[in-house]
Amino acid sequence: MEWVDTGSAMQAPDATFADTREARQAIRAGRWRRHTSGLAPAYVQGNLVILPVDLASDFMRFCQSNPKPCPLLAVGQAGDPALPTLGRDIDIRTDVPAYRVYRDGVLVGEVDDLKALWRDDFVAFVLGCSFSFEHGLIEAGIPLRHVDEGKNVAMYRTNIQTVPAGPFHGPMVVSMRPMKAADAIRAVQITARVPQVHGAPVHIGDPALIGIADITQPDFGDAVRIAPDELPVFWACGVTPQAVVMAAKPALCITHSPGYMLITDMLNRDLPFA
């Protein structure tokens, strides 16, 4: 299987798109193969999980039982790559910059489209993404280190266990953003209002308390500098299904590559507020 280079030597987006269809067209045409943080800042981005239809019901129950890491935005019809509730022209086979392919729980490759892999029994799930609430944090004047450093956000497996459903079980994955204490308080207030994109943090402070042994070594994404006067702030993350897939070992599962999201036509400001 051909691998796509999604290594950590990523730069900050050197372009943004005011029109989401233009952004998806750039991704579809292969002109954008990098992380999507800040790419279309006013619009909702989504994590992706694709499973055979015989596992779809169990995964739906898993998401419903774990709304912090897996807030459902949309579920496709079996065999249909369109997601009209998220965007009229979306084709889930081509509109994500990089996809991961898991077989029996093992990551076997990354591809830049799913045209050769798509099957009539595939069901696509799109989950809310923290890149969506980053727009609100930046507008509130809260600096985000990974954005300033031109990196993907840091993500970690934790010892926080998800609620199992059918074969799906495993640890929660979290994303981390270092902040000064006052900014962390404001970030809690801002993100608590948007549960569809993970809501409030699940932990602030000592990473060891949630099973992270070395915060300088993220499991996904890129490490960032944490200043002495900053606290690590952890949000539930939509990469959780990838850790769950590794534990559940379904015969086949396809996801986005961490940080390489689906850009939707939903405006961040239109997300339901808690």
Swiss-Prot record:
Keywords: Lyase. The keyword Lyase applies. Disulfide bonds: none annotated. It holds the Pfam family D-Glu_cyclase. One of its GO terms (molecular function) is lyase activity. Its EC number is 4.2.1.-. It comes from the Bacteria. InterPro entries: D-Glu_cyclase (IPR009906), Putative_hydro-lyase (IPR038021), UPF0317 (IPR016938). PANTHER family: D-GLUTAMATE CYCLASE, MITOCHONDRIAL. Belongs to the D-glutamate cyclase family. This is Putative hydro-lyase Veis_4744. The lineage of its organism: Bacteria, Pseudomonadati, Pseudomonadota, Betaproteobacteria, Burkholderiales.
